[in-house]
Amino acid sequence: MPTFLEQRYCRKHLRCVRHITLDPKGRGAVRIHMIPPREDAPDAPFLLLLNGDKLVPLNLSWAILLANFMDRLEPFAGLEISESDWHAMADAAVAETHKTYPFTKKTELAEDLSLMLTSLVAIARGQEPEAEVGVLSLGDYAAEMTAPHRMDLMLSAMRKDGAWHCNQKCLHCYAAGQSLADAPELSTQQWLDILRRLRSANIPQVTFTGGEPTLRADLVELVDAAQWFVTRLNTNGQLLTPELCAKLYGASLDSVQVTLYSADPAIHNALVGADGFEKTVQGIRNAVAAGLIVSVNTPLCSLNTDYAATLRFAASLGVRYATCSGLIPSGSAEGAESRATRLTEQALTQVLQEAEAVVEELGMELDFTSPGWLPEETLRALGLHLIPSCGACLSNMALAPDGSIIPCQSWLSSAPLGNMLTDDWASVWNSERCAAIRAESAKMDHVCQLQGGNREEGARC
């Protein structure tokens, strides 16, 4: 049980998500969100979310130490920190922590702070930490959570004013034809209100997506208003002009993910239903030139199996990070034309085997993001360390264009769980339906609920 001094500190300082960014303008920026456990679970660990994707459990004493350091760092937001300033902040954080732990030597607290920060930076940058770090899966932590770690914001609808509202018409679009994907779009002020509500709900990461989010004239304003969050933009890249990229960089967008189906213009254009290859490629170049962290995403099918060539092409554009997937079984990807291009397990394994050889050669990073398409042992044998599992109502949720809350960004045909503008967050999160979907995800059985485990619920209107 926490001591009296620890309980007092928690009541005053640790009831909400805390956030700092180290080296914000550098290539090795480290975003740290410290997420408290439920108030009725005082012995549960705090959870650190590093750069929006790495999870680290933290005990209470180190959470208090880190919170005190965050308090000292906050006044320096956007400023360059000298070595003397850094040491002064660390000393002040140690002194404040000593008030909660008066029988612990300040030298020990200082050593702990240094070890913790060094280790967190190492983990965030994919390096080996000095400290021993425990392993914590979301399945183990699910009962302590009060919100997902990421909310995907579908800023733009697939249809608007009765007409198609996207500058592409992708063969495998997960949103096309789903009822909530065509919902009326919210205004700028309504999305700004939602960002405030998401922060109050302790959700540390948002993704701006669509449809095509760059069709929104207020995109930069919304990204700028979301600087407390880890932010990502999912786009087809056609509208990523040098001017827009510079503004997004100035608004502190953390990363941009561009969908590139192939290095072959004809294949890419056939799959996106538009003559967009050159604009997408130029958009990638513009984003890289602006200093944005860029990743390329490729849904894999029988028409773009030369994925190794796509990775080489992406690397030539300055891209280091890549993701690929099977076809999400929703929207247009449920149609006969898309289904006919789905890869067999053997074919997909061959594509990934060739891809892994290329990323190893070029020093790129590759993740496969579709749960249930390949067995875990196959993915590990290929050298893929991320084993995807369904995150619906657990690690991630999404908002439709009208603010409707849905289990994930592909879950656009069933009744919403609520609306972010009008419903109390706790009542949505703790509702029987949301809890049931979360319980399925928490099994961590590496199956997409729209594909297997909860298909009936996903199809229910």
Please tell me what each predicted stretch does.
Residues 1-77, 142-144:
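Acidic, low-complexity/disordered tracts enriched in E/D and polar residues
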Residues 2-13, 30-37, 254, 261, ...:
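Radical SAM enzyme [4Fe-4S]-AdoMet core and its adjacent flexible, acidic
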Residues 3, 58-150:
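Long, charge-rich, low-complexity alpha-helical segments
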Residues 5, 9, 14, 404-461:
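Flexible mid-to-C-terminal extensions adjoining Fe-S/redox cofactors in radical SAM and related proteins
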Residues 101, 111-247, 251, 255:
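Conserved alpha-helical substructure of the radical SAM core
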Residues 128-150, 370-378, 417-436:
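Short, charged low-complexity linear segments at domain edges
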Residues 159, 166, 170-173, 390-393, ...:
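Short cysteine clusters
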